[in-house]
């Protein structure tokens, strides 16, 4: 480093080191054993498939069929039965439309809404008395209360009956959880977990871990389904560990902790992030690419926020816009590794996709990365000038700098034939569902990261912008933002059935991005300061298999 560089005052911050070291670098392949397990899995899949198909034409079995589908989804094995589930739900929808005749209307409503069917909430009018209050009989049905509570999170703007039902069920369930602490601690815990995080916001693999032991305790459980859930979980965990080993070797080659020590070393957490977006085996290459992009996006974030000086950032931004290795000589020494790392992962994926005639898909991902970097540069400009943007100015840029519009486009790369050029173009236009996911990411991040970022030269957060513009307290802003976050979730539900030209598996990736935020940033910035909860999640998903 030159004497000139040494005099530069950098907005440096010391982030906690990685808690994982090289734990995931080595992967022990057990192919022979896995082949035997896969044979058993295929037999179990056929058993469950028959259960689904046999119930289709028997209307009296349709409620039980919905309960079976719900169990399959919560056990994390719906990817084994995508076609069968789609066929079953379409058949039931064609049979009843909005006029559901079976039991468990709350379950019917939730499953169809989360699958992208727009069914009416008028079915819940039967739950109310003439004076508008909810029927007293509902308070005695714990399972029914839980089902109704979970259904309310699939509401959209203007559905007042669901807003009322949420208040009603939360009040009842909160009381029940306290009353049952001693008499039925298992049920009390189950209720508390639901109140803490509704099903609609949970990550599938984490819900599978939580639900498998619960399902096993049900006297009515399907033995084939239970065994399939356990074996399937462990099989998939083995694939995920193999992928993480590959990403770990790539990260080790960059040696970020030594070469760029100012940046967060969160590669394992970034893989967890990508795993939250898609865990299914067929998305393996997409998941590996996304994990690498998120890992480097974290370093880019820290370069702009916590280390780079304004003139350096201008040069780096221009280099990313040009996207050419010939730009590398214009960069400061420490930025060269980062720039080369970014270009290399896109080039590598371009070569992989080129074998299928889809190399051009990377051009969409590059465009979203360029826009992402431009948003960082705008925030760096504001920070350099000491400018506090209005809340509206801030959000127009912060939606992009959250990284979620970039990730919403990038996560489609490598997903297979389901992704078309039109799907990428749709994502790049930032449709309402992408904007909603971005809003959730930005607002949750700002609520919990603001205090740490104030301690260094950093653009005013959306919290500070709102406080200054409207002359209100931080506590008031947090309430406003939490309401905006809930509204964004409603926008996601509203948009799922609207985007008919975009396949549901692609929409699900955008929704899953929002779900990851609800895990990582619900109570604090659990990504920067990795706590015990996230460590436990990662260990349970990537270290410890489920006992069979």
Swiss-Prot record:
What is the UniProt remark on how the cofactor binds and its stoichiometry?
Binds 3 Mg(2+) ions per subunit.
List residues traversing the bilayer. none
Q: In which pathway does it act?
A: Secondary metabolite biosynthesis; terpenoid biosynthesis
Entry-linked InterPro entries: Isoprenoid_synthase_dom_sf, Terpene_cyclase-like_1_C, Terpene_cyclase_plant_C1, Terpene_synth_N, Terpene_synth_N_sf, Terpene_synthase-like, Terpene_synthase_metal-bd, Terpenoid_cyclase/PrenylTrfase
Which EC number(s) does the record attach to this protein?
A: 4.2.3.57
For the ligand (Mg(2+) 2), the binding residues are 301, 305
Tell me which residues bind Mg(2+) 1: 301, 305
> Which positions in this protein are listed as binding Mg(2+) 3?
445, 449, 453
Any idea which UniProt keywords this protein has? Lyase, Magnesium, Metal-binding
> Which reaction(s) does the protein catalyse, per the Swiss-Prot or TrEMBL entry?
(2E,6E)-farnesyl diphosphate = (-)-(E)-beta-caryophyllene + diphosphate
Q: Where is motif DDXXD motif found?
A: 301-305
- Gene3D superfamilies linked: Farnesyl Diphosphate Synthase, Terpene synthase, N-terminal domain
* Tissue expression notes: Higher levels in leaves than in flowers and stems.
Q: Name one Pfam family in it.
A: Terpene_synth_C
Query: Per its Swiss-Prot or TrEMBL entry, what cofactor is needed?
Result: Mg(2+)
Signal peptide: which range, if any? Answer: none
A GO term for molecular function:
(-)-E-beta-caryophyllene synthase activity
What GO biological process term is on the record, naming one? diterpenoid biosynthetic process
What family is it from? Belongs to the terpene synthase family.
Q: What is known of its domains?
A: The Asp-Asp-Xaa-Xaa-Asp/Glu (DDXXD/E) motif is important for the catalytic activity, presumably through binding to Mg(2+).
User: Per its database record, what is this protein's job?
Assistant: Sesquiterpene synthase involved in the biosynthesis of beta-caryophyllene, a sesquiterpene with anti-inflammatory and anti-carcinogenic activities.
Summary of subunit composition and partner proteins: Monomer.
Protein name in the entry: E-beta-caryophyllene synthase
Instruction: State the organism named in the record.
Output: Tanacetum parthenium
Task: Quote the gene name from the UniProt entry.
Answer: CarS
């Amino acid at each position: 480093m030159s004497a000139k560089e040494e005099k530069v005052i950098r907005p440096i911050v010391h982030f906690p080191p990685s808690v994982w070291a090289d734990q995931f670098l080595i992967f022990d392949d057990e192919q022979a054993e896995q082949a035997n397990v896969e044979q058993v899995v295929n037999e179990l899949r056929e058993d469950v498939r028959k259960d689904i198909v046999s119930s289709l034409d028997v209307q009296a079995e349709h409620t039980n069929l919905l309960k079976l589908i719900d169990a399959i989804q919560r056990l994390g094995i719906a990817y084994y039965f995508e076609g069968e589930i789609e066929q079953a739900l379409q058949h039931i929808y064609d049979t009843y439309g909005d006029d559901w005749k079976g039991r468990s209307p709350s379950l019917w409503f939730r499953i169809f809404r989360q699958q992208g069917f727009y069914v009416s909430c008028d079915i819940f009018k039967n739950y109310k008395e003439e004076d508008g209050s909810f029927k007293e009989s509902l308070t005695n049905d714990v399972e029914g209360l839980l089902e109704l509570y979970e259904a309310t999170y699939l509401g959209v703007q203007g559905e007042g009956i669901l807003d009322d039902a949420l208040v009603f069920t939360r009040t009842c369930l909160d009381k029940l959880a306290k009353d049952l602490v001693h008499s039925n601690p298992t049920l009390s815990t189950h209720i508390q977990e639901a109140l803490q995080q509704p099903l609609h916001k949970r990550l599938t693999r984490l819900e599978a871990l939580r639900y498998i032991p619960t399902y096993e305790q049900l006297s009515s459980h399907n033995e084939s389904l239970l065994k399939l859930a356990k074996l399937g979980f462990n099989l998939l965990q083995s694939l995920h560990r193999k992928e993480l080993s590959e990403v770990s070797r790539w990260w080790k080659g960059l040696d970020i902790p030594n070469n760029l020590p100012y940046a967060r070393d969160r590669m394992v957490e970034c893989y967890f992030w990508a795993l939250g977006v898609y865990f299914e085996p067929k998305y393996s290459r997409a998941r590996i690419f996304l994990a690498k992009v998120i890992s480097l996006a974290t370093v880019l974030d820290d370069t702009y926020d916590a280390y780079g000086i304004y003139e350096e950032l201008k040069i780096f931004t221009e280099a990313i816009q040009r996207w050419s290795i010939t730009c590398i000589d214009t960069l400061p020494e420490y930025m060269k590794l980062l720039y080369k790392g970014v270009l290399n992962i896109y080039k590598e994926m371009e070569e992989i996709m080129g074998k299928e005639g889809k190399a051009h898909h990377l051009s969409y991902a590059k465009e979203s990365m360029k826009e992402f970097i431009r948003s960082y540069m705008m925030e760096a400009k504001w920070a350099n000038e000491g400018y506090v943007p209005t809340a509206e100015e801030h959000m127009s840029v912060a939606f992009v700098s959250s990284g979620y519009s970039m990730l919403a486009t990038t996560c489609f790369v490598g997903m297979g034939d389901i992704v078309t050029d039109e799907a990428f173009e749709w994502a790049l236009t930032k449709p309402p569902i992408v904007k909603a996911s971005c809003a959730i990411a930005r607002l949750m991040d700002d609520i919990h990261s603001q205090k740490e970022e104030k301690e260094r030269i950093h653009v005013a957060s959306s919290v500070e912008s709102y406080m200054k513009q409207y002359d209100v307290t931080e506590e008031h802003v947090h309430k406003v933002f939490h309401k905006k976050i809930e509204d964004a979730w409603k926008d996601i539900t509203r948009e799922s059935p609207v985007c008919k030209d975009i396949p549901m598996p692609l929409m699900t990736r955008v929704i899953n991005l929002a779900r990851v935020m609800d895990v990582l940033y619900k109570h604090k910035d659990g990504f920067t300061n990795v706590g015990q909860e996230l460590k436990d999640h990662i260990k349970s998903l990537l270290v410890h298999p489920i006992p069979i």
